[in-house]
């Protein structure tokens, strides 16, 4: 039972955790709430409603969610009218735990139920029980809702939701449901609208974006990319995230042929061991993954490839770990998201495999992966010194107002003296320095 509110809350603030899809969802939630008269707050302390758009992919994201919730518990003790809601993936598959561990949370809402959020908040004054909106909607894509975007240069655009792959370690099919795609014409119309609004770059999003389909038009993701590229030839186009088994030669040919499709592919491998990949239910072997890398580079020699890596998955041996390290060297990733394995409730691995790699071993293997990737990244970035590259300026550098930060088509971050340039400008920069994470240079 919850305490009834004496007044209607009017302002809100959103904490966003996790992936780009969650960032896009927070922009959709902002639009839906604003349409019903709620006002975004610039900071949490002045908001009547604090929403936490949660991520369940890894344990550390849930830990950060818990830390902020405990901070809000103290604030709610001082201000009982504060409304706290948890959105997204965590409540979708751990409803009872959210309510039991955090009894001060007023409501929870899953990723398919954001259209009902404003009505839920409006009804809180009369609610006795804590509302939970967690129904799956296999048709919901939020198409037609114009997000309130956080930036004005680069935009995220979800083109599909959900995932049908059921990898052993992954909660996404549980939290996001089955795959469904936004239609071709709707995607193109939204990208054209972004261009007219002044955006210079768009990233097409999906948990498994290469599975996008428009059955009525007989189009796959290669057809979508080509259509979007032709519709907005002056915009940079990116996409994420891809599954290795779905990277087709036709798709790579489109990227190679269209100048505004960025030469960057994020292709999560998770492990370099075929035994591990089989246990993870990834649907490909080490050799098949390397064949796809070779195919990509045969069409796009200058492509930047990035990845995700998991250290210490169930039953992983030292031999399996060494195969991951050797694959990293063979591919030469620009960068990687690197984590040690944490059990996710509701996954196939949680039900069927022992989490038998000691934490000390997981952390040691992860550190080896990080150190190797840093060395590979440093070598790749140092090879850029002396080259002149195209950069889309995105913002002032955190180091100095006299510097700008931008990215190359390969998604490499470049910091340079701003001179006469401003954010949203596209310019040429001669690279003069490099670390394992950043390039630096001078505008040409």
Swiss-Prot record:
Record field: catalytic activity: N(6)-dimethylallyladenosine(37) in tRNA + (sulfur carrier)-SH + AH2 + 2 S-adenosyl-L-methionine = 2-methylsulfanyl-N(6)-dimethylallyladenosine(37) in tRNA + (sulfur carrier)-H + 5'-deoxyadenosine + L-methionine + A + S-adenosyl-L-homocysteine + 2 H(+)
Binding-site positions, [4Fe-4S] cluster 1? 19, 55, 89
Co-factor: note: Binds 2 [4Fe-4S] clusters. One cluster is coordinated with 3 cysteines and an exchangeable S-adenosyl-L-methionine.
Q: Where in the cell is it found?
A: Cytoplasm
Family per similarity comment: Belongs to the methylthiotransferase family. MiaB subfamily.
Q: Which domain of life is it from?
A: Bacteria
Residues in domain MTTase N-terminal? Answer: 10-126
This chain's source organism reads Chlorobaculum tepidum (strain ATCC 49652 / DSM 12025 / NBRC 103806 / TLS)
Question: Where is each TRAM domain found?
Answer: 382-444
Which Pfam families does the entry mention?
A: Radical_SAM (PF04055), TRAM (PF01938), UPF0004 (PF00919)
Residue numbers binding [4Fe-4S] cluster 2: 163, 167, 170
* Role this protein plays: Catalyzes the methylthiolation of N6-(dimethylallyl)adenosine (i(6)A), leading to the formation of 2-methylthio-N6-(dimethylallyl)adenosine (ms(2)i(6)A) at position 37 in tRNAs that read codons beginning with uridine.
Cofactor(s) the protein requires to work: [4Fe-4S] cluster
Quaternary structure and interacting proteins, as annotated? Monomer.
Q: Which top EC class is given?
A: transferase
GO CC, alphabetical: cytosol
Q: What is this protein called?
A: tRNA-2-methylthio-N(6)-dimethylallyladenosine synthase
Give the enzyme's EC designation.
2.8.4.3
Radical SAM core domain location, by residue? 149-379
Leader peptide range in chain numbering: none
What keywords is this UniProt entry annotated with?
4Fe-4S, Cytoplasm, Iron, Iron-sulfur, Metal-binding, S-adenosyl-L-methionine, Transferase, tRNA processing
UniProt-listed InterPro entries: Elp3/MiaA/NifB-like_rSAM (IPR006638), Methylthiotransferase (IPR005839), Methylthiotransferase_CS (IPR020612), Methylthiotransferase_N (IPR013848), Methylthiotransferase_N_sf (IPR038135), MiaB_methiolase (IPR006463), rSAM (IPR007197), rSAM_horseshoe (IPR023404)
What GO annotations for molecular function exist for this entry? 4 iron, 4 sulfur cluster binding; metal ion binding; N6-isopentenyladenosine methylthiotransferase activity
């Amino acid at each position: 039972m919850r305490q009834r509110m004496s007044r209607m809350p009017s302002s809100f603030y959103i904490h966003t955790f996790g992936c780009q899809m969650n960032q896009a969802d927070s922009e959709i939630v902002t639009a839906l709430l604003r349409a019903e008269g709620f006002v975004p707050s610039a900071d949490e302390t002045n908001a009547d409603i604090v929403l936490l758009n949660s991520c369940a992919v890894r344990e550390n994201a849930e830990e950060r969610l818990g830390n902020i919730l405990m901070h809000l518990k103290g604030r709610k003790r001082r201000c009982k009218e504060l409304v706290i809601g948890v959105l997204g993936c965590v409540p979708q598959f751990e409803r009872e735990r959210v309510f039991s561990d955090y009894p001060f949370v007023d409501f929870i809402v899953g990723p398919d139920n954001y259209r009902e959020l404003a009505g839920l908040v409006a009804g809180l004054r009369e609610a006795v029980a804590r509302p939970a909106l967690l129904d799956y909607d296999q048709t919901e894509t939020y198409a037609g809702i114009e997000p309130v975007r956080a930036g004005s240069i680069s935009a995220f655009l979800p083109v599909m939701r959900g995932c049908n792959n059921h990898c052993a370690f992954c909660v996404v099919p549980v939290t996001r449901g089955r795959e469904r795609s936004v239609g071709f014409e709707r995607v193109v119309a939204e990208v054209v609208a972004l261009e007219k609004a002044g955006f210079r770059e768009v990233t097409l999003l999906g948990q498994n974006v290469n599975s996008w389909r428009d059955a009525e038009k007989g189009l796959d993701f290669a057809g979508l990319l080509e259509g979007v590229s032709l519709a907005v030839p002056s915009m940079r186009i990116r996409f994420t995230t891809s599954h290795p088994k779905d990277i087709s030669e036709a798709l790579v040919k489109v990227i190679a042929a269209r100048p505004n499709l960025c030469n960057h592919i994020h292709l999560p491998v998770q492990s370099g061991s075929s035994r591990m990949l089989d246990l993870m239910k990834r649907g490909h072997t080490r050799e098949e993954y390397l064949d796809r890398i070779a195919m990509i580079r045969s069409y796009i020699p200058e492509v930047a490839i990035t990845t995700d890596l998991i250290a210490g998955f169930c039953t992983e041996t030292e031999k399996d770990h060494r195969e991951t390290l050797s694959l990293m060297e063979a591919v030469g990733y620009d960068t990687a998201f690197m984590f040690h394995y944490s059990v996710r409730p509701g996954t196939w691995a949680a039900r069927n495999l022992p989490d038998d790699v000691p934490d000390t071993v997981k952390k040691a293997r992860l550190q080896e992966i990080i150190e190797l990737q840093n060395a590979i990244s440093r070598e790749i970035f140092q090879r850029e010194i002396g080259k002149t590259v195209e950069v889309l300026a995105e913002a002032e550098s955190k180091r100095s107002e006299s510097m700008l930060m931008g990215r190359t088509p390969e998604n490499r971050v470049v910091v340079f003296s701003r001179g006469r340039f401003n954010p949203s400008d596209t310019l040429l920069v001669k690279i003069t320095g490099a670390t394992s994470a950043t390039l630096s240079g001078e505008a040409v």
